[in-house]
Amino acid sequence: MERTRSKPVRNLPETIHSLLGLKSHMTSDWVKSVCNIAKNTSSTSKKEEDDFVSVDLQSIRDQLSALTVQVNDQNKLRRQILNEFLDLKGNIRVFCRVKPLGATEKLRPPVASDTRNVIIKLSETKRKTYNFDRVFQPDSSQDDVFLEIEPVIKSVIDGYNACIFAYGQTGTGKTYTMEGLPNSPGIVPRAIKGLFKQVEESNHMFTIHFSMLEIYMGNLKDLLLSEATKPISPIPPSLSIHTDPNGEIDIENLVKLKVDDFNEILRLYKVGCRSRATASTNSNSVSSRSHCMIRVSVTSLGAPERRRETNKIWLVDLGGSERVLKTRATGRRFDEGKAINLSLSALGDVINSLQRKNSHIPYRNSKLTQVLKDSLGQDSKTLMLVHISPKEDDLCETICSLNFATRAKNIHLGQDESTEEQAKKEAVMMNLQKMMEKIEQEREMSLRKMRNLNETLEKLTGKPHVIEEEEKDVVREVIHVTPKKPRNKSRRASDVFPSFMRPTASSNRRLSGADFSVTPNSSSFKSRRNSMISVRAESACLPVKKKKNRFDSACDSSDRSVSKSTSIMRQNTADDATVYSQDISECDIKLVVSEHKPKPLQMGPGSATKSRSNISNFEKDVMQKIGGTEFSRINSWLRSQSENRSYVLDKTQLPATHFLENLNRSLEKSPTQSFTTEKITGNELEGIEETKTNETVVNPTLMLKKLFELQCLCSAEEEDQILSRFPIPGYEDDDESRYPPILENDGFSQHIDNEWFGVNNYSADWERDSPATIPLLECEPDLKQLLPELGLDRSLKPRGLAVAEGAAPPLLRAQETLGERGKGPTFMQKLQALCFRILLGLGFMDVGFGNDFFNGLTK
């Protein structure tokens, strides 16, 4: 074996030389010729393969074009047959659904029914029969109802307008028929799901938009624009209705969301249902107090066989048609029921005019008929489901509902037909239905072939076959859900500056360009009610070419945006319990009266300087925070109390002398303390701001005790301590009994008292400040000589403590003027105040609160 291995090694040089000799016989032309042969062979095979693929592609495209034409013809034929079928049934088809009886209700109801008739047993010998296109028995299911409605959904794809609405009294099952339950969906989810199914089976491109609104007391509200709010929150204004040049109804500023699947519409529907107006009535604990309307718009640009490029279907849940005599409603419930019945009556008038083919149709008598104008007449398809109750207690409402349905039945056909004509019509409808089913089967086969060819084409070319259509920019409304901003508790920088350094209202208006001044960092004040964070949806039109987010930025509008909210101010009575649907103020104004309660200062012999400095600092702080004109807080408090005389503290009259004696006793125990009025300059007041929040804060009226503590610390005792020593017979000692009642939930008054808030054009009328009189000088003539020296002569005039500007006694002058004087005038001022307190304690003077004031508290 070793020899065999060594033999190739010895022959290796010979082998290499032989290979080199073989290479010497080859030339460069031979190499080029081999390369050319290889290139020609590959190009020929590639060309043959490309020719084969191109032939297949062309064949597939031809087949797709032929199938497209075939499907279009089938759609046109199906649309014609369906239109004939619906015309034979009538432009407005009226169904009746009988509510099943409960387990505890009567077993023998006065209502009997079959598949087409409803029989009302009025007495033992008298009965009345009502004819319908279809009567659904109490044991009928949601599937049975939708089976009759499905042809109308198909006509929507063909470009026809449609309207389906539920009619009947409250509690007969209208909402159940329209909405249903999770395990038994109603017409709304089934119709929308069927609409998307028809779109998927079609060979055209469709765009679907969803809108939802309600008609509450004659006003149109967009349910997708805002969630359910409290009565004090602003709601959008009533939407306006317009008619475009093509005769189509257009609702201005109505949010129109572009949707791509059923789940998106379902989410939007749940959002809209939360904003509906519902309330408790005698007929139902959760009664719908408005008409809920759902609009689904369908647009297809590349379908010439359609009736319209854009059509719509309305799904309407009408309000309860029960009489006010049954509900015994009052107040807001009465107004709601009246508005519902008026709109339903207008709907009946429109249907009656269509039945008689009058030249004038009264669409403008109600917002409901204006909105449904293009869905009730002409070539629209309308279905009305009348809901009745078989209970004997609801017999009157049942008869009213059946009479209304009779007016709407057979508008196109006119008079009732004979039995033979009706049998012939039913036979024709059966033939048309069979033809339509056959065409739909052929159309389904053609669509299946088209899908298979598209898959093959996608494998060959890498992209599917797309029907060429003009690509246009879509203007969509983007919904921005903006939560309420968190509260900003920081003080504004302008609050620490004097009034003359703060910007005026006119300068703010010039800088901002707005009609009113809005503070950029205004703080949010707490409301009287604990409210949840409200969410608002604002729309903006943005031109985009490609959709980024399906739900967040998918709405379509013709270059519109949602208008700003305006509303009305109204008092909320106990009857105004409707969810969200309360009137509120057009401009939210926050009125905050800040109260400063410094601790009482003990005026000892060695603390006069310290007390004076504290009072001076306190007055300076007040001067920086509050601006206004000179006024008397005591008379302002009197004026506010005289305005609130409508409140009753107790049924018993309070004796005025009793309070005067208590007040004099309390003043006798604090002889070293004084009280002064203040002179306030400036034209701004902290706490009065015009903001854009939805909540209002109204502080209770300041009591006399708080005014004394605020300005002069006249008494070291609290008012509750004083009142506790002098209990009133028959008067309970609680927080509510000590003070006059304040505004809670009864309403809100925008009245701003000029005396409190320092209006610029305020002029103090000191001649009418206080109704109290002091006949002290008439009783004690010897005091007339002493009081002018003390500067107290003017304070004893019939106006009590109300002093005129420029003539105030020294003890009632502002503290800022006292700070500029020397020790002598200051000592005289304190001496005068001491004399004044002594006179008050001895009973020679009073504070000006006469019997009229205390009598007014009990009126």
Curated annotation (Swiss-Prot):
- What GO terms are given for molecular function? ATP binding; microtubule binding; microtubule motor activity
State the GO CC annotations.
microtubule; mitochondrion
Query: Which keywords has UniProt assigned to this entry?
Result: ATP-binding, Coiled coil, Microtubule, Motor protein, Nucleotide-binding
Which domain of life does the UniProt lineage start with? Eukaryota
Q: Which residues bind ATP?
A: G168, Q169, T170, G171, T172, G173, K174, T175
* Gene Ontology terms describing biological process: microtubule-based movement
> Mind telling me which residue stretches traverse the membrane in this protein?
none
Coiled-coil annotation reads: 422-463
InterPro entries in UniProt: Kinesin-like_fam, Kinesin_motor_dom, Kinesin_motor_dom_sf, P-loop_NTPase
Name the residue ranges with Polar residues bias.
518-530
The Kinesin motor domain is annotated at 91-411
The annotated region (Disordered) lies at 511-530
Report the family membership: Belongs to the TRAFAC class myosin-kinesin ATPase superfamily. Kinesin family. KIN-14 subfamily.
Its name, as the record gives it, is: Kinesin-like protein KIN-14T
